[in-house]
Swiss-Prot record:
The protein's role, per its UniProt record: Essential for recycling GMP and indirectly, cGMP.
EC number per UniProt: 2.7.4.8
Keyword Plastid: no
Highest classification ranks of the organism: Bacteria, Bacillati, Cyanobacteriota, Cyanophyceae, Synechococcales
Gene it is expressed from: gmk
Native organism: Prochlorococcus marinus subsp. pastoris (strain CCMP1986 / NIES-2087 / MED4)
Protein name: Guanylate kinase
Pfam families per UniProt: Guanylate_kin
Record family assignment: Belongs to the guanylate kinase family.
Enzyme class at the top of the EC tree: transferase
UniProt xrefs under InterPro entries: GK/Ca_channel_bsu (IPR008145), Guanylate_kin-like_dom (IPR008144), Guanylate_kinase (IPR017665), P-loop_NTPase (IPR027417)
Amino acid sequence: MKNLKKLIIITGPSGVGKGTVIKELLDRNKDIWLSISATTRNPRVGEKDDLNYYFIGEERFKDMIDKKEFLEWAQFAGNYYGTPLSTVNEKIEKGFIVLLEIEVEGAKQIKEKFPESLSIFLLPPSKEELEKRIRNRGTEKEEAIDRRLSRANYEIASSNQFDFVLTNHDVDETVKEVLKIIKS
């Protein structure tokens, strides 16, 4: 892969605001492209192939694994998820900054394989604020919230393994900081 300085990893615990920060980054900078993952799971209501995910069959996914066509991949909840290498390469060659919004373990894998890539870990202002954000989504049962919070503690403890650590107090300020890092 060429010019890995244009490969930006954004990670952090669930509820930290990765999606919100990334949406703002994309709105403010047309040179940034958000990588689309491939998955074997079925599309959810409103999701579109080639926009939200590349929806592919398990046989094709496993074939892509065998051919080493993923930047990273994982199996989660009975489905496969991965970042297709060809699309990332194509966008970098066209001059885009490629952004990966990825969970912490996947981010560590990519950073290990491609140390020249740039990794940014987003922290919540506090554990209390993180819990509030997760609860305010209103989409999860207590047991799932507890799992997310427990996982967040583990992930936050590994934040020192990333190039930059930013606390997401305010989306606008966080976006400005990320843009400053990307452009430096």
